[in-house]
Every structure is written in C-alpha cells, then in structure tokens.
Amino acid sequence: MEVHMLSKDNKKSIRKTLEQRRGEYAYYVIKEVADLNDKQLEEKYASLVKKAPVMILSNGLLQTLAFLLAKAETSPEKANQILSRVNEYPPRFIEKLGNDKDEHLLLYLHIVYWLRENVDRNIDVKTLLSQDYSKVLWATKEAIALLNWMRRFAVAMLKEEGKENEGSS
C-alpha cells in the first residue's frame, strides 16, 4: 500500500509505503523516549516493547492492551483523553503525561495512536470488543508489525540493563 504525502515544502509528492510509515513512526516514538534521558524509563520501556509482540501473539491484542492499561492504573477514558489532545505529527505523548511517565501507558498510547491512524479512527479497548473478527485481526497484524519496528529502534536507541557495560571488557 502506498500513500502520497506532501514533502515539507508542500511542492512535491513523496510516496511512502505502509512499511516506511511504520518505521518512521516507530523511530519518532522511540526517539521521544530516548530524548528524555531517563535511564529507568528507557530500560523499562525497551523491555516492554520487546515483550509486547509475544504478549499479543499469546494473549491477543485486546488482552495485551487491557494489561497495559491495568499496569498503568489508567482507565480507557483517561487514555482516550490523552490521545485526543495529541494533534501534531510526530505525536508527542510524554509532554501530555506530565509527571505520570509510565512505560505501560506510553506503549498503550503509541500502539493505539498508530491503530487509529491506520485501521480505525475510534479504536481503543472498548471499541475493539465490539468489532468483527476481520477488523480485530487487521489491528492485531498492524500492532505486531509496528512493534517489530519499535523493537529494532529500542535496541538501537534506548539504554538497557547491562548494555552499557558490554563493550568495556
């Protein structure tokens, strides 16, 4: 699937495949976490991003999203309020969270924002419960494809436990 986007000067069209857009989005959301220079958040977020595809394959997209909200102690309504305040691209979620920089909530927001842009504008945990199987399957495949990109960038850009000392011996 190709998408035509205008370049920054809005004069020529740039063709980007869905895979390119996934990679671009993944880069920006991982960079947002890296730019905080919060080692603890980076470690926790990187670990969670690596585990998320397996969680989705084992438990399903709905249960994984519900798990992320439960661990963040956040309601779907609160998460939707945060998502509704994001009106820029690339999205800047961390500034919308204030002091509540939880890796679970952040990953939920990153996944759901992407799904809203590429599957259905109204997607969240509640709406996925009432969707037909084909839409849930589509959303699941999109989430896993996105997380594969995010995992690659997380490994490259985020601090991980033990990673800093690997090259010093």
Curated annotation (Swiss-Prot):
NCBIfam families named in the record: cas_Cmr5
Principal localisation: cytoplasm
Name of protein: CRISPR system Cmr subunit Cmr5
Gene giving rise to this polypeptide: cmr5
Annotated function: CRISPR (clustered regularly interspaced short palindromic repeat), is an adaptive immune system that provides protection against mobile genetic elements (viruses, transposable elements and conjugative plasmids). CRISPR clusters contain sequences complementary to antecedent mobile elements and target invading nucleic acids. CRISPR clusters are transcribed and processed into CRISPR RNA (crRNA), formerly called psiRNA (prokaryotic silencing) in this organism.
Pfam families in UniProt: Cas_Cmr5
Keyword terms, alphabetized: Antiviral defense, Cytoplasm
Subunit text: Monomer in isolation. Part of the type III-B Cmr ribonucleoprotein (RNP) complex, an elongated RNP with Cmr2 and Cmr3 as the base, with Cmr4 and Cmr5 forming a helical core along the mature crRNA (39 or 45 nt in length), while the complex is capped by Cmr6 and Cmr1. The 5' end of the crRNA is bound to Cmr2 and Cmr3, while Cmr6 and a Cmr1 subunit (Cmr1-1 or Cmr1-2) cap the 3' end of the crRNA.
Cellular component terms (Gene Ontology): cytoplasm
Upper taxonomic lineage: Archaea, Methanobacteriati, Methanobacteriota, Thermococci, Thermococcales
Subcellular location: Cytoplasm
Example GO BP: defense response to virus
Family: Belongs to the CRISPR system Cmr5 family.
